[in-house]
Amino acid sequence: MIEGDLIPAGHSLTEQARTHARTYNLRDHGFQVSDGPLFTAQEAALIKQHAQRVLNGVYETGVPPRTNTGGPDASVHPAYIEAQMPQDCDDVIASAIRHPGVARWAAEISGARRLKIWNAMVMQKRPSGGEKTKVGWHQDRRYNDNITRGPTMTVWIALADVPSALGPVRYVPRSHLWNRHFQTGFFDRDIDRQEREFDIPAGEIWQSVEAVLPAGWAVAHGPDVLHGSGENCGDAPRTSLLLSLGIDDFQVLPAHYFASRQNDPRAAPIIYPSGG
């Protein structure tokens, strides 16, 4: 078992992210780091501010998100909080999910002719949350198969610097090629047990790569790659924006909540091509 990729000590966060951007790609490894910021520093700071407002239960449009595990009393927030469909309640976030730089990059790395948002979330992993800030190894397909048909991808954007101490998203390169449907889940935090039990195909190796990111940078992944994250051992929250994208002629299953939002251009815009 190989734990971690070998980046020399002392490399800056930007150098680490650029190394990952050069080394790993969506097709061959199941994930890809942007080769630069998709949001400017000012954009990332503004979106982070509005993400925090939403997570604190402040909804500028008067419309709540679909779910919010935060709320007005931050003292009782759990260690990991998220709000789903925050574009309904905040204009800055509604604009951010349509950002042309994000759309162009996602289309470029995926080869998509068309990209449509079907879900979005703002998320925060709080410091000193211990085990409760871990996210177990999982494949998005385990969840997406109950919602969508056809190709999908996820884009995860850092709204502030995410060094290793904050528990960045981590990936198992090439695991999307193993032809395995693992039943491990997001909230299964016994990561050591998970790793002992995984059935790794002959000729493949286990490698865990942390997608450390400067503010405004992104990492994208497909539905079959194993990913998760460690605990936040740092001194700042890990705050991010997540976009779930449908590629080309994907469909949302008609019985699901998200199907009811697909004709709403604020909730589920076509972000590529622009004006689509």
Predicted features and spans:
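Non-heme Fe(II)-dependent double-stranded beta-helix
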Residues: M1-H29, D35-W137, Y143-N146, T184, ...
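Double-stranded beta-helix
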Residues: D5-L6, V162-L226, F250, R266, ...
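A short beta-loop-beta micro-motif enriched in histidine and acidic residues
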Residues: S110-G111, D140-T152, W206-Q207, L213, ...
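Active-site region of the double-stranded beta-helix
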Residues: R113, R141, N146-R149, I157-P168, ...
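Histidine-centered metal-chelating micro-motifs
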Residues: R142-Y143, D224-G228
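A short hydrophobic beta-strand segment most commonly corresponding to one strand
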Residues: T154-I157, A236-Q251
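Short proline/glycine-enriched turn/loop segments at secondary-structure junctions
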Residues: G230-G234
